[in-house]
Amino acid sequence: MNPKNAHLATHYLQFDRAQWASLRDSVPLILTEEEIIRLRGINENLSLEEVAAIYLPLSRLLNFYISSNLRQRAILEEFLGTHKQNVPYVIGIAGSVAVGKSTTARLLQALLSRWPEHRRVELVTTDGFLHSNKVLTERGLMKKKGFPESYDMKNLVKFISRIKSGAPKVEAPVYSHLRYDIIPNQKKIVQQPDILILEGLNVLQSGMDYPHDPHHVFVSDFVDFSIYVDASYDLLAHWYINRFLQFRRGAFSDPNSYFHHYAQICEKEAMTVARRLWTEINGLNLNENILPTRERASLIMTKGDNHEVKSVWLKK
């Protein structure tokens, strides 16, 4: 057992792929191959087998947790003599750029919304709470995009706290990956879902990251169950570079793309740019700010080659 796994074993139950897959029980696969193709990311080979082996057991586990949460709330309301309030169950999904957080989030949204309870499941990404490029430029933070200081944490915490207080309608800003910026005057309306999936790089940050300021309130304070999607540094770098090259041949060719100029350079130069962006920005952010939050997650999914999950760690 390597040092990382030995440390995790103290606080987590470990499952290899086969052990985890056996926990699916009788949960049916309710997604078609066409739907899975629509859900997966640009650089991922998500298969029906992966959904059955990894995500169906996960959706079953989450269903148990959510049902337990509802029962606990009902007991408290009966004790207090209060009326039932619709408070969303919040699932946080964290991990590095290029690890496949968005695919995991979309897949869980599709699976959880199809459980017999017909729950309404909303998905919000923390990208919408990045400061605008104008603000980041003024503060000299354009090369720190995705780092904690690049987020409007005050509004993000306000958003999630209103969600958890049962507010009937909450607005979230919308981010465009094409424009690489917030879309002005565009909002996503979240109206009391049963489940909210919040996906982002730093959703597991807590006061431990700011020891000299005990007054911070963090997104993680409002999360009921958290998932960290993990992979080795080398795999993440490889996936990031491949994704960049695919974007260069696709989305970057759009004249409206913020990165349109990268579509004009040769493949060799594009690889050099991608490696630099990974090393100087995304890899640095991973090591400094994202990876240290991994062991705060309720569950860690560790990926191997081809984005296949090879092990799952569930907090005891």
UniProtKB/Swiss-Prot annotation:
CDD domains: PanK (cd02025). Signal peptide: none annotated. Keywords: ATP-binding, Coenzyme A biosynthesis, Cytoplasm, Kinase, Nucleotide-binding, Transferase. One of its GO terms (biological process) is coenzyme A biosynthetic process. It catalyses: (R)-pantothenate + ATP = (R)-4'-phosphopantothenate + ADP + H(+). It is found in: Cytoplasm. Pathway: Cofactor biosynthesis; coenzyme A biosynthesis; CoA from (R)-pantothenate: step 1/5. It holds the Pfam family PRK. ATP binds at G95, S96, V97, A98, V99, G100, K101, S102. GO terms for cellular component: cytoplasm. GO terms for molecular function: ATP binding; pantothenate kinase activity. Belongs to the prokaryotic pantothenate kinase family. NCBIfam families: panK_bact. This is Pantothenate kinase. It comes from Hamiltonella defensa subsp. Acyrthosiphon pisum (strain 5AT). The lineage of its organism: Bacteria, Pseudomonadati, Pseudomonadota, Gammaproteobacteria, Enterobacterales.
